[in-house]
């Protein structure tokens, strides 16, 4: 416990919280242009071909973002919206592409969790 004199000499320093998505610069989402769309393999116990895109953001960063859902229409030069959120089994992928906004279409024939994948309500 410091004395009052010690606190007068140098105040307590705030511990700054390090952000997990620095490329967003405090914004909830950011717009960007895809520079490369490709598949990559996950870490050890899992096996798949995960769809990812390299995106140049309006904040100046170039990040790797995951494309969620089954099937996509994203290609090079597509304008997409990026949100935070990492993919646990893909090292270095700390962002998600938001489906159903800008050039990224929603997932086709999606019945459940539609809002997460930008799918419209099915016709009854």
Curated annotation (Swiss-Prot):
Keywords: Chloroplast, Plastid, Ribonucleoprotein, Ribosomal protein, RNA-binding, rRNA-binding. The keyword RNA-binding applies. It is found in: Plastid, Chloroplast. GO terms for biological process: translation. Signal peptide: none annotated. Residues 11-20, 109-124 have a biased composition (Basic residues). Gene3D superfamilies: Nucleic acid-binding proteins. PROSITE patterns: RIBOSOMAL_S12. PANTHER family: 30S RIBOSOMAL PROTEIN S12 FAMILY MEMBER. With S4 and S5 plays an important role in translational accuracy. Located at the interface of the 30S and 50S subunits. NCBIfam families: rpsL_bact (TIGR00981). Part of the 30S ribosomal subunit. This is Small ribosomal subunit protein uS12c. It comes from Gracilaria tenuistipitata var. liui.
């Amino acid at each position: 416990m410091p004395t009052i004199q010690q606190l007068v000499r140098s105040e307590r320093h705030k511990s700054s919280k390090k952000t997990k998505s620095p490329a967003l610069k405090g914004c909830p989402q950011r717009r960007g242009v895809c520079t490369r769309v490709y598949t990559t393999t996950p870490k050890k116990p899992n096996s798949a071909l995960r769809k990812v895109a390299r995106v140049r953001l309006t904040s100046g960063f170039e990040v790797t973002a995951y494309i969620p859902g089954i099937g996509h229409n994203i290609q090079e030069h597509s304008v997409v919206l990026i949100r935070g959120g990492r993919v646990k089994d893909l090292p270095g992928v700390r962002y998600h592409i938001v489906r159903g906004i800008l050039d990224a279409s929603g997932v086709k024939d999606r019945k459940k969790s539609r809002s997460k994948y930008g799918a419209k309500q099915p016709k009854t």
